[in-house]
Amino acid sequence: MSAAPGLLHQELSCPLCLQLFDAPVTAECGHSFCRACLGRVAGEPAADGTVLCPCCQAPTRPQALSTNLQLARLVEGLAQVPQGHCEEHLDPLSIYCEQDRALVCGVCASLGSHRGHRLLPAAEAHARLKTQLPQQKLQLQEACMRKEKSVAVLEHQLVEVEETVRQFRGAVGEQLGKMRVFLAALEGSLDREAERVRGEAGVALRRELGSLNSYLEQLRQMEKVLEEVADKPQTEFLMKYCLVTSRLQKILAESPPPARLDIQLPIISDDFKFQVWRKMFRALMPALEELTFDPSSAHPSLVVSSSGRRVECSEQKAPPAGEDPRQFDKAVAVVAHQQLSEGEHYWEVDVGDKPRWALGVIAAEAPRRGRLHAVPSQGLWLLGLREGKILEAHVEAKEPRALRSPERRPTRIGLYLSFGDGVLSFYDASDADALVPLFAFHERLPRPVYPFFDVCWHDKGKNAQPLLLVGPEGAEA
């Protein structure tokens, strides 16, 4: 039996334009297309020079496309069959086979391969199938909409990737640039110090060398005198011996002490590298925020200076708190005027020898009335000192987490906040040239937040020391 009528036409049709092949080419995966159709659909080659097969998505090289002469000859032969007639029997295609979804002639339907199939007159099949087109069109439109959304999402993600990479490269370049500037300045400073030491040591050593050479010359002269005296007659020998030996003893007594030069240069060790890292850490911090305390938020017992950069707890009886929800009525605390909501920020607070305090940030929506529960879930991220020696982080727990006691109690605290990285870090900033990490919260903070300062109760004068905000010119006295 020959192939079913219509199936040959289907097999010789391009899967892209659904028409008979025109200049058919075959890809490496085995699928065939009109050359023009493939060029239109495949688009520009990828980085490796390949295009994707529209049927199976397999990569194929455009230069490997081969003209399919056998297909071309079959198409040419099929084109000679009158349109609407069976390729095998040349009879009109008047019957529709539902089972094979193909038009067939009467001979194929009654005697050929479609005998016994579900068959309909072509006119009836046309009317029935035409009613199904709107539903199929709707399905096609819905599929297009879904794919268009997918395309939009991918295009947006592509833009996001480009922007993320651009920002990453910018941040890397900026930070590494700062590191290079810092290290170049440090290298220059150390080189100048080494040159200074070399110069001073050279002058001192040359001075010592001149003195020693002069003394050595005296010793050699005395050696010659002794040799001359040894050859003298008895009387002259005895007369000169006492003079010569007396002079020799005087010269020996004036012997210059051995040179002792103390060269003061840093020892290049792991500790040196650690010190450089700490100094570089400070150099990479953003510029100091110029914060001021917000008096309207301060507990009634707190006194804020006219400059807004000094706050202390008064030992005088405080008036009752007002009704302003922005004011702390139980916690002896205050926030900064400035709210922070994006980017990087760094500020410093002089705590001096104050034995109790807490610093950090508070969410703008966090309550300020009543007793504060100082944990992140309540909008507070704090580091504090108690009893003058115990640093503690106010983490999500019943009690604050006590940290390892530092070698020395910090007198100045540095706080670094990065919304992009989701980090709030605390540092011992007592050394003007270096920062020592103390603790860090790693989480995405709500926006905005306010710098928070818990001055704590004065404790009958034991904790009366102020908190001072540090500006570019230093802390207020």
From Swiss-Prot:
Changing residue 198 to E: Reduced cell viability upon peroxide and saponin treatment. Disulfide bond formation at Cys-242 occurs in case of membrane damage that cause the entry of the oxidized milieu of the extracellular space, resulting in homooligomerization. The modification S-nitrosocysteine is found at residue 144. Changing residue 176 to A: Monomeric; fails to translocate to membrane; reduced cell viability upon peroxide and saponin treatment. It is found in: Cell membrane, Sarcolemma; Cytoplasmic vesicle membrane. Zn(2+) 3 binds at residues 86, 89, 105, 108. Changing residue 179 to A: Monomeric; fails to translocate to membrane; reduced cell viability upon peroxide and saponin treatment. Keywords: Cell membrane, Coiled coil, Cytoplasmic vesicle, Disulfide bond, Exocytosis, Membrane, Metal-binding, Phosphoprotein, S-nitrosylation, Transferase, Transport, Ubl conjugation pathway, Zinc, Zinc-finger. One of its GO terms (molecular function) is ubiquitin conjugating enzyme binding. Belongs to the TRIM/RBCC family. Muscle-specific E3 ubiquitin-protein ligase that plays a central role in cell membrane repair by nucleating the assembly of the repair machinery at injury sites. Its ubiquitination activity is mediated by E2 ubiquitin-conjugating enzymes UBE2D1, UBE2D2 and UBE2D3. Acts as a sensor of oxidation: upon membrane damage, entry of extracellular oxidative environment results in disulfide bond formation and homooligomerization at the injury site. This oligomerization acts as a nucleation site for recruitment of TRIM72-containing vesicles to the injury site, leading to membrane patch formation. This is Tripartite motif-containing protein 72. It comes from Homo sapiens (Human). The gene is TRIM72.
